[in-house]
Regions:
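Glycine-rich loop(s) and the adjacent beta-strand/alpha-helix scaffold that form part
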Residues: 1-32, 88, 252, 258-261, ...
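Acidic/polar loop patches that form or flank catalytic/metal-binding clefts of enzymes
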Residues: 10-19, 69-71, 160-163, 273
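Phosphate/diphosphate-binding loops
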Residues: 36-86
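Short, small/polar residue-rich loop motifs at catalytic or cofactor-binding pockets
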Residues: 55-57, 206-208, 248
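Short, ordered coil/turn segments that flank beta-strands lining enzyme active or ligand-binding pockets
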Residues: 65-66, 216, 223, 257
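Gly/Pro-rich active-site capping loops and adjacent beta-alpha segments
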Residues: 68-113, 117, 227-236, 240-243, ...
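Helix-rich C-terminal "cap"/substrate-channel and partner-interaction subdomain
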Residues: 90-196, 265, 269
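A glycine-rich dinucleotide-binding beta-alpha-beta segment and adjacent secondary-structure elements
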Residues: 161-245
Length: 273
Protein backbone atom coordinates (compact mmCIF):
# COMPACT_ATOMS: atom_id res chain seq x y z
CA UNK A 1 0.00 0.00 0.00
CA UNK A 2 2.84 2.42 0.81
CA UNK A 3 4.51 1.73 -2.51
CA UNK A 4 1.28 2.40 -4.39
CA UNK A 5 0.72 5.68 -2.53
CA UNK A 6 4.26 6.88 -3.22
CA UNK A 7 4.02 6.00 -6.90
CA UNK A 8 0.64 7.70 -7.35
CA UNK A 9 1.97 10.82 -5.61
CA UNK A 10 4.48 11.32 -8.44
CA UNK A 11 2.01 10.59 -11.24
CA UNK A 12 2.22 6.82 -11.77
CA UNK A 13 -0.45 4.90 -13.62
CA UNK A 14 -1.83 1.77 -11.95
CA UNK A 15 -2.63 -1.65 -13.36
CA UNK A 16 -3.94 -5.05 -12.19
CA UNK A 17 -5.66 -3.44 -9.20
CA UNK A 18 -8.51 -5.97 -9.42
CA UNK A 19 -6.16 -8.97 -9.42
CA UNK A 20 -5.25 -11.14 -6.47
CA UNK A 21 -3.52 -14.42 -5.76
CA UNK A 22 -5.96 -15.96 -3.32
CA UNK A 23 -7.33 -19.25 -2.10
CA UNK A 24 -9.87 -20.29 0.52
CA UNK A 25 -8.83 -19.31 4.03
CA UNK A 26 -10.39 -19.48 7.47
CA UNK A 27 -10.86 -16.12 9.22
CA UNK A 28 -12.05 -16.15 12.81
CA UNK A 29 -13.39 -13.04 14.58
CA UNK A 30 -11.13 -13.40 17.62
CA UNK A 31 -7.84 -13.68 15.70
CA UNK A 32 -6.36 -10.88 13.55
CA UNK A 33 -5.11 -12.87 10.55
CA UNK A 34 -6.49 -15.62 8.33
CA UNK A 35 -5.39 -19.25 8.41
CA UNK A 36 -4.57 -21.59 5.57
CA UNK A 37 -6.40 -24.86 6.20
CA UNK A 38 -4.88 -28.28 5.47
CA UNK A 39 -8.03 -29.94 4.16
CA UNK A 40 -6.52 -33.24 3.11
CA UNK A 41 -4.08 -33.75 5.96
CA UNK A 42 -1.24 -34.01 3.46
CA UNK A 43 -0.39 -30.35 2.87
CA UNK A 44 -2.53 -27.70 1.21
CA UNK A 45 -1.69 -28.78 -2.33
CA UNK A 46 -2.15 -32.51 -1.58
CA UNK A 47 0.49 -33.20 -4.24
CA UNK A 48 2.65 -35.52 -2.16
CA UNK A 49 -0.21 -37.96 -1.77
CA UNK A 50 -1.53 -37.74 -5.32
CA UNK A 51 1.96 -38.06 -6.82
CA UNK A 52 2.31 -41.42 -5.07
CA UNK A 53 -1.17 -42.43 -6.25
CA UNK A 54 -2.33 -43.04 -2.69
CA UNK A 55 -5.97 -42.87 -1.74
CA UNK A 56 -6.80 -39.87 0.45
CA UNK A 57 -7.04 -40.62 4.15
CA UNK A 58 -10.05 -38.41 4.72
CA UNK A 59 -12.74 -36.82 2.61
CA UNK A 60 -13.87 -33.21 2.50
CA UNK A 61 -16.01 -31.00 0.30
CA UNK A 62 -16.60 -27.28 -0.15
CA UNK A 63 -20.15 -25.97 -0.16
CA UNK A 64 -21.68 -22.53 -0.51
CA UNK A 65 -23.82 -21.01 2.22
CA UNK A 66 -26.79 -22.98 0.89
CA UNK A 67 -24.99 -26.32 1.18
CA UNK A 68 -24.25 -26.84 -2.52
CA UNK A 69 -20.93 -27.94 -4.00
CA UNK A 70 -19.73 -25.59 -6.73
CA UNK A 71 -16.21 -26.61 -7.81
CA UNK A 72 -13.63 -29.34 -7.64
CA UNK A 73 -12.04 -29.08 -4.22
CA UNK A 74 -8.73 -30.16 -5.71
CA UNK A 75 -8.49 -26.57 -6.89
CA UNK A 76 -5.63 -24.46 -8.15
CA UNK A 77 -5.18 -22.65 -4.86
CA UNK A 78 -4.01 -19.29 -6.21
CA UNK A 79 -7.03 -19.06 -8.53
CA UNK A 80 -9.70 -20.44 -6.21
CA UNK A 81 -10.87 -16.98 -5.13
CA UNK A 82 -12.23 -16.33 -8.62
CA UNK A 83 -14.58 -19.32 -8.24
CA UNK A 84 -15.63 -18.15 -4.80
CA UNK A 85 -16.34 -14.61 -5.97
CA UNK A 86 -19.15 -15.66 -8.32
CA UNK A 87 -22.03 -13.14 -8.02
CA UNK A 88 -25.69 -14.17 -8.25
CA UNK A 89 -27.35 -11.36 -10.22
CA UNK A 90 -30.84 -12.66 -9.43
CA UNK A 91 -30.49 -12.80 -5.66
CA UNK A 92 -28.02 -9.88 -5.65
CA UNK A 93 -25.57 -11.69 -3.40
CA UNK A 94 -22.35 -13.68 -3.26
CA UNK A 95 -23.66 -17.18 -2.44
CA UNK A 96 -20.15 -18.60 -1.96
CA UNK A 97 -18.94 -15.98 0.53
CA UNK A 98 -18.60 -17.45 3.00
CA UNK A 99 -18.16 -21.05 1.95
CA UNK A 100 -17.80 -24.04 4.25
CA UNK A 101 -15.50 -27.04 4.31
CA UNK A 102 -17.39 -30.14 5.44
CA UNK A 103 -15.53 -33.18 6.78
CA UNK A 104 -15.98 -35.99 9.28
CA UNK A 105 -14.24 -37.82 12.11
CA UNK A 106 -11.55 -39.25 9.83
CA UNK A 107 -10.09 -35.81 9.11
CA UNK A 108 -10.38 -34.43 12.64
CA UNK A 109 -8.50 -37.47 13.96
CA UNK A 110 -5.88 -37.34 11.22
CA UNK A 111 -4.05 -34.36 12.73
CA UNK A 112 -4.04 -30.59 12.75
CA UNK A 113 -6.60 -29.02 10.45
CA UNK A 114 -4.76 -25.70 10.45
CA UNK A 115 -1.83 -25.64 8.05
CA UNK A 116 1.41 -25.59 10.04
CA UNK A 117 3.87 -25.10 7.16
CA UNK A 118 2.86 -21.47 6.53
CA UNK A 119 0.48 -18.78 7.71
CA UNK A 120 -0.03 -17.88 11.40
CA UNK A 121 0.75 -21.45 12.48
CA UNK A 122 3.86 -21.58 10.31
CA UNK A 123 7.46 -20.68 11.12
CA UNK A 124 6.56 -17.38 12.82
CA UNK A 125 4.32 -19.23 15.28
CA UNK A 126 1.79 -16.44 15.70
CA UNK A 127 -0.58 -19.19 16.78
CA UNK A 128 0.00 -22.81 17.81
CA UNK A 129 -2.75 -24.97 16.37
CA UNK A 130 -3.54 -27.80 18.78
CA UNK A 131 -2.45 -31.26 17.66
CA UNK A 132 -5.90 -32.78 18.16
CA UNK A 133 -7.88 -29.67 17.10
CA UNK A 134 -9.50 -29.56 20.55
CA UNK A 135 -8.59 -25.92 21.25
CA UNK A 136 -10.10 -24.80 17.96
CA UNK A 137 -13.25 -26.81 18.62
CA UNK A 138 -13.53 -25.15 22.03
CA UNK A 139 -13.12 -21.70 20.49
CA UNK A 140 -15.84 -22.42 17.95
CA UNK A 141 -13.48 -22.17 14.99
CA UNK A 142 -14.41 -25.71 14.02
CA UNK A 143 -18.13 -26.42 14.24
CA UNK A 144 -19.26 -29.92 15.25
CA UNK A 145 -22.53 -31.78 14.71
CA UNK A 146 -23.38 -35.36 15.62
CA UNK A 147 -25.43 -35.53 12.41
CA UNK A 148 -25.35 -33.60 9.16
CA UNK A 149 -28.70 -32.05 10.03
CA UNK A 150 -27.38 -30.83 13.37
CA UNK A 151 -24.26 -29.44 11.73
CA UNK A 152 -26.34 -27.65 9.10
CA UNK A 153 -28.51 -25.97 11.72
CA UNK A 154 -25.43 -24.74 13.58
CA UNK A 155 -24.07 -23.04 10.47
CA UNK A 156 -27.45 -21.61 9.37
CA UNK A 157 -27.86 -23.97 6.45
CA UNK A 158 -30.88 -25.95 5.28
CA UNK A 159 -30.33 -29.50 6.64
CA UNK A 160 -32.01 -31.24 3.71
CA UNK A 161 -29.79 -29.50 1.16
CA UNK A 162 -26.57 -30.41 2.98
CA UNK A 163 -27.79 -33.98 3.39
CA UNK A 164 -28.55 -34.18 -0.36
CA UNK A 165 -25.12 -32.81 -1.20
CA UNK A 166 -23.32 -35.33 0.99
CA UNK A 167 -25.53 -38.16 -0.29
CA UNK A 168 -24.57 -37.24 -3.86
CA UNK A 169 -20.90 -36.99 -2.85
CA UNK A 170 -20.95 -40.40 -1.21
CA UNK A 171 -22.54 -41.89 -4.31
CA UNK A 172 -19.69 -40.43 -6.39
CA UNK A 173 -17.24 -42.07 -4.01
CA UNK A 174 -18.98 -45.42 -4.46
CA UNK A 175 -18.74 -45.22 -8.25
CA UNK A 176 -15.27 -43.65 -8.30
CA UNK A 177 -16.42 -40.78 -10.49
CA UNK A 178 -17.43 -37.15 -9.91
CA UNK A 179 -19.18 -36.31 -13.21
CA UNK A 180 -20.23 -32.77 -12.25
CA UNK A 181 -16.96 -31.40 -10.84
CA UNK A 182 -14.39 -34.04 -11.90
CA UNK A 183 -12.64 -34.48 -8.55
CA UNK A 184 -9.56 -36.71 -8.70
CA UNK A 185 -10.66 -40.32 -8.01
CA UNK A 186 -7.95 -40.58 -5.34
CA UNK A 187 -9.80 -37.90 -3.37
CA UNK A 188 -13.20 -39.55 -3.53
CA UNK A 189 -13.54 -40.53 0.14
CA UNK A 190 -17.01 -40.76 1.65
CA UNK A 191 -18.29 -38.55 4.44
CA UNK A 192 -19.97 -41.21 6.55
CA UNK A 193 -18.06 -41.31 9.83
CA UNK A 194 -19.80 -39.01 12.33
CA UNK A 195 -19.54 -36.63 14.00
CA UNK A 196 -19.31 -34.10 11.20
CA UNK A 197 -17.40 -30.83 11.19
CA UNK A 198 -17.35 -27.52 9.32
CA UNK A 199 -15.00 -24.57 8.97
CA UNK A 200 -16.12 -21.25 7.52
CA UNK A 201 -14.02 -20.14 4.54
CA UNK A 202 -13.40 -16.84 2.77
CA UNK A 203 -11.33 -15.87 -0.27
CA UNK A 204 -7.98 -14.61 0.96
CA UNK A 205 -4.34 -15.27 1.48
CA UNK A 206 -1.14 -14.83 -0.46
CA UNK A 207 -1.05 -11.41 -2.09
CA UNK A 208 -2.56 -8.69 -4.24
CA UNK A 209 -1.02 -8.05 -7.65
CA UNK A 210 -1.90 -4.42 -8.37
CA UNK A 211 0.37 -1.40 -8.33
CA UNK A 212 2.30 1.02 -10.52
CA UNK A 213 2.39 0.05 -14.19
CA UNK A 214 5.85 -0.58 -15.58
CA UNK A 215 7.48 -1.37 -18.90
CA UNK A 216 10.04 -3.97 -19.98
CA UNK A 217 12.81 -1.87 -18.44
CA UNK A 218 11.03 -1.84 -15.05
CA UNK A 219 10.39 1.89 -15.48
CA UNK A 220 7.20 3.12 -13.85
CA UNK A 221 4.83 4.73 -16.38
CA UNK A 222 2.43 7.64 -16.12
CA UNK A 223 -1.17 7.41 -17.48
CA UNK A 224 0.10 8.40 -20.95
CA UNK A 225 2.55 5.50 -21.13
CA UNK A 226 5.59 7.69 -20.56
CA UNK A 227 8.38 6.62 -18.22
CA UNK A 228 8.69 8.64 -15.02
CA UNK A 229 12.38 9.60 -14.75
CA UNK A 230 14.41 7.67 -12.19
CA UNK A 231 11.43 5.65 -10.90
CA UNK A 232 11.56 1.85 -11.13
CA UNK A 233 9.50 -0.98 -9.69
CA UNK A 234 9.80 -4.74 -9.27
CA UNK A 235 7.88 -7.56 -7.65
CA UNK A 236 4.28 -7.78 -6.52
CA UNK A 237 3.77 -4.02 -6.24
CA UNK A 238 2.46 -3.81 -9.79
CA UNK A 239 3.07 -7.43 -10.71
CA UNK A 240 3.30 -8.32 -14.40
CA UNK A 241 1.28 -11.49 -13.82
CA UNK A 242 -2.10 -9.81 -13.64
CA UNK A 243 -5.13 -12.06 -13.40
CA UNK A 244 -3.43 -15.38 -12.67
CA UNK A 245 -0.47 -16.14 -10.44
CA UNK A 246 1.69 -18.80 -12.13
CA UNK A 247 3.07 -20.93 -9.28
CA UNK A 248 4.43 -21.05 -5.77
CA UNK A 249 7.54 -18.87 -5.59
CA UNK A 250 6.66 -16.98 -8.75
CA UNK A 251 6.52 -13.77 -6.74
CA UNK A 252 10.12 -14.27 -5.60
CA UNK A 253 11.27 -14.90 -9.16
CA UNK A 254 9.57 -11.71 -10.30
CA UNK A 255 11.35 -9.72 -7.58
CA UNK A 256 14.72 -11.15 -8.61
CA UNK A 257 14.25 -10.82 -12.37
CA UNK A 258 12.74 -7.35 -12.46
CA UNK A 259 14.91 -6.17 -9.59
CA UNK A 260 17.95 -6.95 -11.72
CA UNK A 261 16.41 -5.29 -14.78
CA UNK A 262 15.52 -2.21 -12.72
CA UNK A 263 19.02 -1.96 -11.25
CA UNK A 264 20.74 -2.29 -14.63
CA UNK A 265 18.56 0.39 -16.20
CA UNK A 266 18.82 2.69 -13.19
CA UNK A 267 22.62 2.54 -13.37
CA UNK A 268 22.48 3.15 -17.12
CA UNK A 269 20.14 6.11 -16.64
CA UNK A 270 22.33 7.61 -13.92
CA UNK A 271 25.41 7.25 -16.10
CA UNK A 272 23.80 9.12 -18.96
CA UNK A 273 23.20 12.25 -16.91
Amino acid sequence: ADGIKMAVAVGADLWHMNCVSARLCAKFPDFPTAFFIDFSGKGWSNRSMLAKKQKAIAGFIFVDKYGRRYMTEEMKPHAAAYEVGNYDSHKLEFPRIPSWSIFDRRRIENGQVGQISSGPSGPQQLYRWSRDNSAELARGWIVKGDTLAELARQINMQPKQLERTVLTWNACCDTGSDPEFHRNPLELVKLDNPPFFAIKLYPGGSNTLGGPRRNHKSQVLNPFGEAIPSLYAAGECGSVYGLLYPAGGGNLAECIAFGRIAAENAVREAGSK
